[in-house]
Design a protein with these regions (language model features):
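Fungal secretory targeting signals
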Residues: 1-16
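Contiguous, structured surface segment used for ligand recognition
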Residues: 14-218, 551, 555-562, 569, ...
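Structural recognition of the beta-strand scaffold that forms the well-ordered cores
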Residues: 31-33, 37, 41, 222-225, ...
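Flexible, acidic glycine-rich loops studded with aromatic residues
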Residues: 114-117, 121, 423-431, 435-441, ...
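Feature activates predominantly on carbohydrate-active enzymes
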Residues: 151-356, 361-376, 527-531
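Loop/turn elements at helix/coil->beta-strand transitions in domains of secreted/extracellular proteins
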Residues: 248-253, 298-303, 370-373, 417-422, ...
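Active-site neighborhood of glycoside hydrolase catalytic domains
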Residues: 335-337, 342-441, 446-456
Length: 594
């Protein structure tokens, strides 16, 4: 941390927002805000209730990214003062009203219970604003100017307009305008970054009025991927990451929920899976937990995408159904059959596997579909040699295996589509196995920019996350132990993706690098990845944050600035220092609770 403090002292309060908005203007007037400030929620569309007056609204900005934010007439839906805290609990899917209600509640909590005292962002002997004689924020107007799409709680990429505008006048009127509830939530998040806790612990203020912001994201898919199989995580661990995602305007949370090491997902119709496959019977995500996590994400405009990786990375199934898995836990020559131990792969030509997957997905998919438009079927690092031990195949010949893999993927994706979900796969299915994928399928790339270029050249939508930049677990050394006879050959025991990926490296990654201009529209966005061989609840927060925030800004603001240049570390460093402090408060205080 010694290197961060000097950067903090360089912070210009005119540019401390993260991720960086499209346009931002501010002044130097001090305004204090009280806990009883009213939130006036205005809305257009057919679902408006509690109408008490009609308010024509005009927002004018030379650089407004969304002309639809202008000249809209909206109605007062309701006024909220001192909103109750919410944990997002509920039954069924999430509506636009749910998102705005939660956003107002969490904004109030952030302003008055989780705010930042910015002492380290000023030089010594800085004179803190005094409440006496200062102006006040008199109201916060939240205006949703268009009817939300039906899919607001589980959208496909691009279905929700996430743009917003924000103004704060010297007279103390804050106005957030957006075409969707998610955009309004983003605007409220930005509003909290304009305010700071006073050292007297009784007041909250800004010294930036008047403010004018217009903003919208560069990429449609902005997320992190958390592996909850190799280490066991609690619901609260997951919720904290969702909170931080939302605060960084990330809109996807990828839950890599199962792998060879453990099966922590409870499947009520197949209880043996988690009862025998989890590290302990209590280290599971119950059906209720699973619903809670998905809804908690959706109510913050963060779509949780669940992944059950297959056919590889499935050794944990063998603890309950050994007949379904080939090459299970082979030692010591595990590297012949898998990328890492324990080995184990679903058999590729077994009717029993098909029956199992049909039952598994019939259980899981209906519990995913209220909260997500996607389901991730995995497909990475499948080792052909495992099938030499599969009595249904007995070969590692690609000519024999490829048609069987095609059949395997088709079977799974057909079932995913029947529930109205869009399949997601890892890049190997397309690039290594030459599986023909439907044009609806999202391909997730992790190995190289060249792979992204290949995927888009084939006409497929892609998610980026090059392991050389956006793998957050790298640089911690080998997690395997070596026999003394061969240990010297692995010295100094670096992992495969060393060195450690610091925020500057993460920030330097361009998701569009190497992609032909005519194919760049197929890059939906990307994810930063947290694999958990050496990460657990003890260190997960600091392993992900604030480095993932660097990826969040690239995905929201783009890798290039308005002049087409690579984004500046000089500009980013002080802003990231402040976001680090705010993320720490969000994570340390834990999930929003009722």
């Amino acid at each position: 941390m010694r290197s961060l403090l000097p950067l903090c002292l360089l912070t210009s309060f005119a540019a401390a927002l993260w991720p960086k908005p499209v346009s931002y203007e501010n002044g130097k007037t001090v305004l204090f805000i009280a806990e009883d400030v009213p939130f006036n929620w205005y809305q257009t569309g057919t679902d408006v209730r509690f109408i008490t007056d009609q308010v024509p609204f005009l927002f004018v900005s030379d650089s407004n990214p969304s002309p639809d934010l202008q000249n809209k007439t909206v109605s007062l839906k309701k006024t909220i003062t001192k909103p109750d805290s919410s944990d997002g609990a509920g039954d069924g899917g999430v509506s636009g009203d749910d998102i705005v209600n939660f956003a107002i509640s969490s904004t109030w909590q952030t302003l008055f219970k989780r705010n930042l005292y910015p002492w380290k962002f000023h030089p010594r002997n800085w004179s803190e604003p005094k409440p006496d004689g200062a102006g006040s924020v008199t109201r916060i107007d939240v205006r949703v100017l268009s009817a939300n799409p039906d899919s607001i709680g589980k959208p496909l990429a691009g279905e929700v307009d996430e743009s917003y505008s924000l103004t704060l006048t010297e007279d103390g009127v804050a106005t957030i305008s957006a075409n969707s509830s998610v955009g309004a939530a983003h605007g409220l998040t930005t509003l909290t970054q304009l305010f700071f806790a006073h050292s007297d612990k009784q007041h909250v203020y800004t010294n930036l009025a008047p403010v004018k912001i217009t903003d919208s994201p560069k990429f449609q898919h902005r997320g992190i991927n958390l592996d909850t199989s190799r280490a066991a995580f609690s619901v609260d661990d997951v919720k904290r990451q969702i909170d931080a995602c939302a605060y960084n305007k990330m809109n996807r949370f990828h839950l890599h929920v199962t792998d060879s090491q453990s099966w922590p997902l409870e499947v009520p119709s197949i209880p043996e899976l988690s009862a025998k496959g989890a590290y302990r019977p209590d280290l599971v995500f119950t059906a209720s937990d699973f619903q809670t996590m998905q809804r908690y994400a959706a109510i913050q405009g963060v779509e949780m995408i669940t992944e059950i990786d297959m056919p590889g990375h499935t050794a944990s199934i063998a603890y309950s159904f050994p007949e379904l898995i080939t090459a299970f836990n082979i030692q010591p020559n595990w590297d012949t059959y898998a990328a890492e131990p324990p080995t184990g792969t679903l058999k590729l030509n077994s009717p029993k596997v098909s029956e199992f997957l049909n039952k598994l997905l019939d259980d899981v998919l209906p519990r995913v579909s209220p909260y997500s438009a996607y389901f991730h079927t995995g497909g990475d690092e499948v080792n052909k040699n495992a099938y030499t031990l599969d009595e249904t195949v007995k070969s590692n010949d690609t000519a024999i295996l490829q048609p069987l893999m095609q059949k395997f993927v088709d079977r799974n994706h057909d079932q995913v589509r029947k529930l109205g979900l869009t399949p997601v796969v890892w890049e190997e299915m397309l690039l290594d196995w030459n599986v023909t994928l439907g044009k609806d399928v999202i391909v997730q790339s992790w190995q190289s920019d060249a792979a992204v270029a290949q995927i888009t050249a084939k006409g497929h939508k892609v998610l980026v996350g090059n392991y050389n930049y956006w793998y957050l677990d790298c640089g911690k050394g080998q997690w395997l132990n070596f026999d003394p006879s061969v240990a010297a050959s692995s010295y100094p025991y670096q992992d495969y993706c060393a060195p450690f990926h610091n925020w500057r490296l993460i920030y330097s990654y361009d998701p569009l690098a190497g992609v032909a201009p005519e194919n760049q529209h197929l890059v939906l966005g990307g994810e930063a990845h947290m694999w958990s061989e050496q990460t657990d609840p003890v260190n997960v927060d600091r392993m992900i944050w604030p480095r993932a925030a660097a990826a969040a800004e690239i995905l929201w603001s783009g890798a290039k600035d308005e002049q087409g240049r690579n984004r500046s570390q000089i500009d980013a460093a002080p802003r990231l220092s402040e976001m680090r402090e705010r993320c720490h408060i969000v994570l340390w205080r834990g999930p929003f609770v009722s």
